[in-house]
Every structure is written in structure tokens, then in C-alpha cells.
């Protein structure tokens, strides 16, 4: 694809993926402007914050490949649109996915608006996904060809207007080849590790971070039979399916099998735990999702056979759309799903096409 004469703003994070994205687009003839987003203000000098080094990496890459870069601060927008929701959800006992909201509200809204103000026709990011326009003129979001790195799950809330102005150059390229390109062109960050976890938490212990904003509220830890086997520190600090950090590893209670978080009783501040990975309380045949968002603007029809993911990196699970009633979606799975977690996203697929989804209730 030739980009001759077209201006594109590339979200550059200092990582390998966005750096190769910028280089690829320049090779295609685009006028590339790099934009570094600062979405978090606190702890810039802490051992966990890499913002300063990331910016230096962006500048080094930009100098090498010959593109202009600028930094823009979206910290206020991030706290209002993403982090506030993150805290509300955890306070309510759910486990949110802030990366999904960050994409919809910051990277493909605030960032997109800023890029348009710079005279860009399109934006680009280093996400592993694909966009195509179908015969009806609709834009479709597809999985990356490298399914092991596919990130369409995190992008399922994007709409037609956003996708129509977005390029995902890495969607057609295996991750291994991206690393090879970085080395071949001599990128200074070619061997930099991929970022993991929630962006504003970084490598710091999650429980320590959350405790800065939410108070502990100890309560009983019970089995399904009602037997008290321990004490939790606060329901917000646990997620369904959690095994590590429960505090029952050396317990004499039970049959020796591993313990898992199974349910939260918010009204009575009680955490229910079970033993065994396949305990019935951890298996869900039917789920309901709300706060729905559909890439094409329309939901799938009731009765449609689809596939769904209820967490990132999960294999597609066969399901049937039982009902779409306003802002509520009901899915029935061919096989019960493990540790379906309220607050996470249920994302629907028709083959490689990501249709959209909603928040699990």
C-alpha cells in the first residue's frame, strides 16, 4: 500500500512494535509523525515508572528512522475516563480491564482527535490486529494473522469512525518478523522486552498499588458449605479463579487440592473459596453482559452461533447468542467456561472477525 503524500500520526510508546510500525509506514511513503502519550502523572521518579526512559527510546528511534516526534499529556483524560472507572469497578467487587477502556477513550479518541488537529488523515498503532472494508462499505476489525499475538480483544469497543481512520501495519506480520526487522534496521530498542500488565501499575505489586486507593476491609473466607477457613483482606483485592495470594496454601483445611476464589458476597463481605480447578462453582454455562459495543453498530441476531472470549489469550469458545435485549446480551456456551469474571469483557467473533462485546455481569 502506498502512503505517498498522506500524513499519519503513529502512537509511539518506546517499544519495538510501535517503532517498527513507524518505520514500515515511512517505507510506504507516508509522512510520519510520532506521538508519545503520557497517560499517568504519579511516580515518575519511582523504581516502577519507565516513562522517562520510554520517551528517550522514542526520541532515539525517531532520530534513526527520520521522523518528527512530540509528547502529549493525556493524564487528566485518563484519570477521568479510565482510572475512575477502574476504581469504581474494583470497589464494587468486579475485575475491570482498563486496557479496553483506554483504547476506546484515549488511544482511539483523545489521541485520534489530537492527530486530526495535526492534519493527519489516519493514525496507526503497534497493535496486532487488522482492519478491512467489506463489500458493503463497513469497516471490520479482524484478528491479527499471528493469532498468538492477536489484540483484537482489547480493541472490540472501536467503532466505524475510529476504524476508518486507523492503520494496524503489524496485523499482517508475525511477531518474530517484527523483532527481525528491528534488528535489521538497527533500532536502539530492538531487544527491549514487551510491556506487560496494566500500564499505570507497571511492575509494582498489584495489591500494593490498589491499597493506595482502596481501603482493606477484612471478612470471612468460606467454603460453599459455609465453613470459615480463613480471613480475606477485602473483596476488592481478589478475582474469580485466583489461586495465588489467598493465604490458604499451608492450610490444614480441606482435601489437599489447591484453593481458588469462586464467588464474592458483597452484601455480607464474604469471600467464597473452593478446592479443585474444575469445581462446579468455577464453571459458567451462561453469562450476561451489558454496556454493549458493536463494531458495525448492530448486534448479532438472537440464535446466532458465534465464538467468544471471556478473557485475553483464551481460546475461542463456541457459543450461541440467546438474547440481545437493549443493553443486555445473553450467551450460552457449548461447554461451561472457567472462572467467568464480572467486570471483564465478553468479546464475540465470527471466524476472524471481531464483532464487539460487553462487560460481564
Curated annotation (Swiss-Prot):
<dbReference type="Pfam" id="PF03054">
    <property type="entry name" value="tRNA_Me_trans"/>
</dbReference>
<feature type="binding site">
    <location>
        <position position="37"/>
    </location>
    <ligand>
        <name>ATP</name>
    </ligand>
</feature>
<keyword id="KW-0819">tRNA processing</keyword>
<keyword id="KW-0694">RNA-binding</keyword>
<keyword id="KW-0820">tRNA-binding</keyword>
<comment type="function">
    <text>Catalyzes the 2-thiolation of uridine at the wobble position (U34) of tRNA, leading to the formation of s(2)U34.</text>
</comment>
<dbReference type="InterPro" id="IPR023382">
    <property type="entry name" value="MnmA-like_central_sf"/>
</dbReference>
<dbReference type="GO" id="GO:0005524">
    <property type="term" value="F:ATP binding"/>
</dbReference>
<feature type="disulfide bond" description="Alternate">
    <location>
        <begin position="102"/>
        <end position="199"/>
    </location>
</feature>
<protein>
    <recommendedName>
        <fullName>tRNA-specific 2-thiouridylase MnmA</fullName>
        <ecNumber>2.8.1.13</ecNumber>
    </recommendedName>
</protein>
<feature type="region of interest" description="Interaction with tRNA">
    <location>
        <begin position="149"/>
        <end position="151"/>
    </location>
</feature>
<comment type="similarity">
    <text>Belongs to the MnmA/TRMU family.</text>
</comment>
<feature type="region of interest" description="Interaction with target base in tRNA">
    <location>
        <begin position="97"/>
        <end position="99"/>
    </location>
</feature>
<keyword id="KW-0963">Cytoplasm</keyword>
<feature type="site" description="Interaction with tRNA">
    <location>
        <position position="127"/>
    </location>
</feature>
<feature type="binding site">
    <location>
        <begin position="11"/>
        <end position="18"/>
    </location>
    <ligand>
        <name>ATP</name>
    </ligand>
</feature>
<dbReference type="GO" id="GO:0000049">
    <property type="term" value="F:tRNA binding"/>
</dbReference>
<dbReference type="InterPro" id="IPR014729">
    <property type="entry name" value="Rossmann-like_a/b/a_fold"/>
</dbReference>
<keyword id="KW-0067">ATP-binding</keyword>
<keyword id="KW-1015">Disulfide bond</keyword>
<feature type="active site" description="Cysteine persulfide intermediate">
    <location>
        <position position="199"/>
    </location>
</feature>
<dbReference type="Pfam" id="PF20258">
    <property type="entry name" value="tRNA_Me_trans_C"/>
</dbReference>
<dbReference type="Pfam" id="PF20259">
    <property type="entry name" value="tRNA_Me_trans_M"/>
</dbReference>
<dbReference type="InterPro" id="IPR046885">
    <property type="entry name" value="MnmA-like_C"/>
</dbReference>
<feature type="region of interest" description="Interaction with tRNA">
    <location>
        <begin position="311"/>
        <end position="312"/>
    </location>
</feature>
<dbReference type="GO" id="GO:0002143">
    <property type="term" value="P:tRNA wobble position uridine thiolation"/>
</dbReference>
<feature type="site" description="Interaction with tRNA">
    <location>
        <position position="344"/>
    </location>
</feature>
<feature type="binding site">
    <location>
        <position position="126"/>
    </location>
    <ligand>
        <name>ATP</name>
    </ligand>
</feature>
<dbReference type="GO" id="GO:0005737">
    <property type="term" value="C:cytoplasm"/>
</dbReference>
<feature type="active site" description="Nucleophile">
    <location>
        <position position="102"/>
    </location>
</feature>
<dbReference type="GO" id="GO:0103016">
    <property type="term" value="F:tRNA-uridine 2-sulfurtransferase activity"/>
</dbReference>
<dbReference type="InterPro" id="IPR046884">
    <property type="entry name" value="MnmA-like_central"/>
</dbReference>
<keyword id="KW-0547">Nucleotide-binding</keyword>
<dbReference type="InterPro" id="IPR004506">
    <property type="entry name" value="MnmA-like"/>
</dbReference>
<keyword id="KW-0808">Transferase</keyword>
Amino acid at each position: 500500500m502506498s502512503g505517498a503524500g498522506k500524513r499519519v500520526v503513529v502512537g509511539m510508546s518506546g517499544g519495538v512494535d510501535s517503532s517498527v510500525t513507524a518505520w514500515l509506514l515511512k517505507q510506504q511513503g507516508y509522512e510520519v509523525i510520532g506521538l508519545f502519550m503520557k497517560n499517568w502523572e504519579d511516580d515518575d521518579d519511582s523504581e516502577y515508572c519507565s516513562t522517562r526512559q520510554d520517551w528517550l527510546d522514542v526520541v532515539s528511534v525517531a532520530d534513526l528512522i527520520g521522523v518528527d516526534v512530540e509528547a502529549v499529556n493525556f493524564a487528566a483524560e485518563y484519570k477521568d475516563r479510565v482510572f475512575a472507572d477502574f476504581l469504581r469497578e474494583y470497589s464494587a467487587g468486579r475485575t475491570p480491564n482498563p486496557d479496553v477502556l483506554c483504547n476506546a477513550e484515549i488511544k482511539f479518541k483523545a489521541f485520534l482527535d489530537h492527530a486530526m488537529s495535526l492534519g493527519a488523515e489516519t493514525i496507526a498503532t503497534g497493535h496486532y490486529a487488522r482492519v478491512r472494508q467489506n463489500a458493503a462499505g463497513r469497516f471490520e476489525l479482524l484478528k491479527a494473522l499471528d493469532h498468538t499475538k492477536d489484540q483484537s480483544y482489547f480493541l472490540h469497543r472501536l467503532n466505524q469512525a475510529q476504524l476508518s481512520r486507523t492503520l494496524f501495519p503489524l496485523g499482517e506480520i508475525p511477531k518474530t518478523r517484527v523483532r527481525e526487522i528491528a534488528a535489521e534496521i538497527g533500532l536502539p530498542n530492538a531487544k527491549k522486552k514487551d510491556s506487560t500488565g496494566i500500564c499505570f501499575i507497571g511492575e509494582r505489586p498489584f495489591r500494593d498499588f490498589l491499597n493506595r486507593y482502596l481501603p482493606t476491609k477484612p471478612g470471612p473466607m468460606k467454603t460453599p458449605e459455609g465453613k470459615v477457613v480463613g480471613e480475606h483482606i477485602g473483596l476488592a483485592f481478589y478475582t474469580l479463579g485466583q489461586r495465588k495470594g489467598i493465604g490458604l496454601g499451608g492450610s490444614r483445611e480441606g482435601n489437599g487440592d489447591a484453593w481458588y476464589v469462586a464467588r464474592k458476597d458483597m452484601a455480607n463481605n464474604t469471600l467464597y473459596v473452593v478446592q479443585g480447578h474444575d469445581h462446579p462453582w468455577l464453571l459458567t454455562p451462561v453469562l450476561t453482559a451489558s454496556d454493549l459495543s458493536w463494531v458495525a453498530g448492530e448486534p448479532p441476531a438472537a440464535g446466532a452461533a458465534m465464538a467468544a472470549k471471556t478473557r485475553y489469550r483464551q481460546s475461542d469458545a463456541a457459543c450461541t447468542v440467546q438474547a440481545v435485549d437493549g443493553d443486555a446480551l445473553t450467551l450460552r456456551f457449548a461447554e461451561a467456561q472457567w472462572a467467568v469474571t464480572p467486570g471483564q469483557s465478553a468479546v464475540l467473533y465470527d471466524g476472524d472477525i471481531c464483532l464487539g462485546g460487553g462487560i460481564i455481569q
